[in-house]
């Protein structure tokens, strides 16, 4: 293991010898205390007390490089306890060394004149063995339905940045008669959760994140975020749901640069014994700034053309980026199929677990139709029609993929239908949706069972 990072080698050995750090209900639990409610403690009230700072152990739980300064920048605090009043009794949940409780102050609306600010707290219990109970909010009814975490902090950074830039601009005598034009921040990062966001912050970048992995970013949300940054990155999880949602977002907002975490990450196990999948998991193994910069270098948008204004002709020049073009095609399921028995390229399109054999002209047709459906300008449509980067020869370089077309394992049998797949074993039947299936087996389109499954 001399070629591995130290943390990576430790986790690899732990996996080999089945050494786990799984959450344990008998260990990872709060100190519960119940007392009669006082007269001023009404039923339904949530109580809490915040600590002055986070302990080193608590910071390590949040991320390998997270500091007190990072936590404060995103308004995270450690709670001594949280309490809930019900039936004239207060149930206090005290944090322990093996069960930290964190709270984030979330700004909804800043104070204006005599109107006080509107805010709520997000309660986070990361070591709760029951994952569905890790989050709660207080007070009731204050959190907006479509709240974007980190956006108020991003706006504050934008204001601070432009305040400094404007002061420097006005200090220069050459700008005496010129108006200052506000500048955007370089980038922000959509993260898949609280700890991923803190890890991004610990690297010196600005994170934003949603209250659910299935949150659908609206056009209005996207435009609001882009008021403040030049480039928006997304760091999805690399489990099945994360890949599906990351792909959907990349194709809905084609300027977003997606950072796909490396596949080797899933070969390591987390505290629950499941494959590692998120950015914090990556940071535990590769925590240097250089490691993150390498991921940023590989990030691409689904937008596969770029435009540059030509000062001589006073017109826009348009070009296709071949790397982004092939990435766009992969996002839409287009690959070349590895076949040792054939010297010619076989093009395929994968939809869920169903594979269709296609020709290069089908790929060109897809892009032409997509351009029309997306209402791209005539200049871009002509660029697509005339580009040699969509020729048969160029498409020979489409990413090659190897697929498993067997419909069984040593203990399961698979049946593929148009709308879903069924995995049958001695213990039962598991249904896999057409989009988001965890099956790593595929079927040719002509071999799909033509039956509608209820």
Residue ranges: model-predicted function:
Residues 112, 174-188, 194-320, 354-355:
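TOPRIM fold recognition
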Residues 7, 54-55, 64, 193, ...:
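Generic non-transmembrane alpha-helix signal with a bias for helix starts/N-cap capping motifs
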């Amino acid at each position: 293991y001399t070629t591995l990072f130290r943390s990576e080698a430790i986790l690899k050995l732990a996996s080999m010898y089945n050494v786990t750090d799984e959450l344990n209900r008998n260990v990872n639990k709060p100190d519960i205390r119940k007392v009669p409610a006082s007269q001023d403690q009404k039923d339904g009230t949530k109580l809490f007390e915040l600590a002055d700072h986070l302990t080193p152990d608590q910071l390590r739980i949040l991320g390998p490089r997270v500091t007190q300064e990072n936590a404060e920048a995103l308004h995270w605090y450690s709670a001594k306890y949280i309490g809930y009043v019900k039936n004239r009794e207060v149930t206090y949940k005290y944090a322990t060394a093996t069960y930290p409780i964190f709270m984030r102050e979330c700004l909804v609306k800043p104070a204006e004149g005599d109107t006080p600010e509107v805010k709520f707290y997000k309660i986070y219990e990361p070591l709760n063995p029951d994952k569905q109970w890790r989050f709660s909010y207080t007070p009731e009814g204050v959190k907006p339905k479509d709240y974007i975490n980190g956006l108020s902090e991003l706006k504050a950074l934008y204001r601070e940045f432009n305040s400094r830039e404007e002061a420097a601009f006005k200090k220069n005598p050459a700008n005496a008669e010129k108006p200052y034009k506000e500048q955007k921040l370089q980038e922000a990062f959509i993260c898949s959760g609280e700890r991923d966001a803190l890890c991004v912050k610990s690297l010196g970048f600005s994170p934003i994140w949603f209250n659910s992995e299935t949150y659908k970013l609206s056009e209005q949300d996207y435009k609001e975020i882009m008021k403040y940054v030049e480039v928006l990155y997304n760091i999805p999880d690399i489990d099945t749901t994360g890949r599906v949602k990351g792909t959907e977002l990349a194709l809905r907002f084609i300027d977003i640069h997606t950072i796909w975490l490396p596949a080797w990450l899933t070969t390591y196990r987390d505290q629950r014994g499941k494959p590692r999948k998120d950015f914090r998991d990556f940071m535990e193994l590769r925590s240097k700034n250089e490691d993150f910069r390498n991921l940023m270098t590989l990030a691409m948008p689904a937008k596969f053309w770029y435009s540059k204004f030509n000062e001589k002709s006073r017109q826009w020049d348009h070009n296709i980026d071949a790397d982004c073009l092939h990435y766009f095609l992969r996002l839409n399921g287009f690959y070349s199929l590895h076949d040792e028995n054939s010297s010619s390229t076989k093009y395929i399109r994968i939809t869920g677990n169903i594979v269709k054999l296609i020709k290069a002209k089908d790929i060109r047709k897809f892009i032409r139709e997509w351009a029309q459906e997306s209402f791209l300008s005539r200049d871009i449509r002509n660029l697509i029609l005339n580009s040699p980067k969509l020729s048969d020869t160029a498409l020979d370089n489409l990413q090659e993929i190897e697929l498993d077309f067997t419909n069984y394992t040593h203990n399961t049998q698979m049946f593929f239908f148009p709308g879903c797949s069924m995995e049958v074993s001695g213990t039962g039947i598991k249904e896999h949706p057409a989009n988001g299936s965890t099956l790593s087996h595929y079927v040719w389109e002509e071999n799909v069972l033509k039956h509608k499954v209820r």
